[in-house]
Amino acid sequence: MSEKGRLFTSESVTEGHPDKICDAISDSVLDALLAQDPRSRVAVETLVTTGQVHVVGEVTTTAKEAFADITNTVRERILDIGYDSSDKGFDGASCGVNIGIGAQSPDIAQGVDTAHETRVEGAADPLDAQGAGDQGLMFGYAINDTPERMPLPIALAHRLSRRLTEVRKNGVLPYLRPDGKTQVTIEFEDDVPVRLDTVVISTQHAADIDLENTLTPDIREKVLNTVLNDLAHDTLDTSSTRLLVNPTGKFVVGGPMGDAGLTGRKIIVDTYGGWARHGGGAFSGKDPSKVDRSAAYAMRWVAKNIVAAGLAERVEVQVAYAIGKAAPVGLFIETFGTATVDPVKIEKIVPEVFDLRPGAIIRDLDLLRPIYAQTAAYGHFGRTDVELPWEQLNKVDDLKRAI
């Protein structure tokens, strides 16, 4: 049955949003530790509020210099985001920074360092030695909506957020401040995006800026129109798009002064904008022994290669783990009726082409590197501005041969 006039919405936030400040701090600390000790075990959570940053969690590492320098890492990242003055509501140079970090639980470390397969079953394969750092389920998704194989609503929302930051940092709109959000509502017919219905852009700004005469026309011209011109989507009608800029009428107080922020509170923004399911685990501040992060990246890698290989127009992949075990306990693949081959065959060949044990994921995606701070804002998937290993299409030929 034809389905017409359905509206689907996704949102993004800028790097100056309080929750994203926390993600950025947590991932900057992670990167600093991995740069000196690639085997660091890291689980760092951050809270920001007016004039204060609190960094807590568990870390086991030999990176003594990076560990001792966490306070400076925090300050540098806040300043890089753009909070460098009390006039903006937050200043990385003068805010209070409190560190409360302990060591990783030895009970967890035991299961990661010596997996059930090695400890109980006597497995000899080195990749069977590393167990999952926790139980859990992770999803990956890909679709042919965009060249980056992401759902169009979240892809467009991220482009708008990145552009909002770009015009602030390069001086095109110097009166903007770091905090901001975007939201995109798109009309779909039979799962095809046909019309951009509404765009909401809320951005922090200097106190003396007029909403109607300055901010709204500037955002339309320098942000929305620029992004839409670059998008050039084949089926999307943008001729009657409604733009709402700062619908409250004013957005001067922002950042940690406006709202407290926490690591891991933007997991839908980080992934597929609500278009695909989510296992519930956040990414930022976690080293790749945590399958919340590494397995979610692997599932995106699997899904994107399936779609790129022409085996389905869109696909969602789920994997599940037990803490302390290397082999997944479950794998589920949904093609939503778009598969070009028997879906059972796809589910059969995925474990043959992709080794989904945590140690193998870390090896194949080269995850023991300081690459995570760049993922803290604007999404972890489908990025067009940075190269990420889980976005590579290096398994397409293997999938075609296996099928």
Curated annotation (Swiss-Prot):
Top-rank EC class of the record's enzyme: transferase
Protein's recorded name: S-adenosylmethionine synthase
Gene Ontology MF annotations: ATP binding; magnesium ion binding; methionine adenosyltransferase activity
Catalysis: reaction(s): L-methionine + ATP + H2O = S-adenosyl-L-methionine + phosphate + diphosphate
Cofactor entry: Mg(2+); K(+)
Chief localization: cytoplasm
Residues binding K(+), per UniProt: 45
List of residues binding Mg(2+): 19
